[in-house]
Amino acid sequence: MRKEERYKGVLNWFNKHVPVAETELHYDNPYQLLIAVILSAQCTDKRVNMITPALFRDFPTPEVMAASTSEVIFEYIRSVSYPNNKSKHLVGMAKMLMSDFDGVVPSDIDELQKLPGVGRKTANVIASVVYNKPAMAVDTHVFRVANRIGLTNNSKTPLETEKELVKHIPEEQIPIAHH
């Protein structure tokens, strides 16, 4: 089977069986989604959804979180993986949102990646989910499965996988394709 046929088959299957693909993380605004995605690194969405209600309640804006400390944030997120690093990233992210972006989560992938705790995958999730940009978030699962079913030519990195996938997926489907 040719690669183009493989892509078409996969996209058709998902369009038929999962017509509304969306994140399982619970959030009400871009700031909350950014926090949730940062926390979800090497952690389940279920666990993140258990701890974010209290975090979102007590730190409803970047301004409030920026005024806090990583020690305080740690107490809210202690049950996620790597809470020490993530608590520092969240406070740093909030401070940078306030100082560099007027408290607004940026839509540009390069700008997003300047925020502490935000790598390419997280930036792509925010760009695609919040701003409906054609950004492909490639995590370890997408990377592994894309290689396994022949959507890529044995790419060696998530970035190689991302570039290969976006070449073959229609632009309007990219924002939902990573789900």
Segments from the language model and where they lie:
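Catalytic cores of DNA base-excision repair glycosylases
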Residues: 2-179
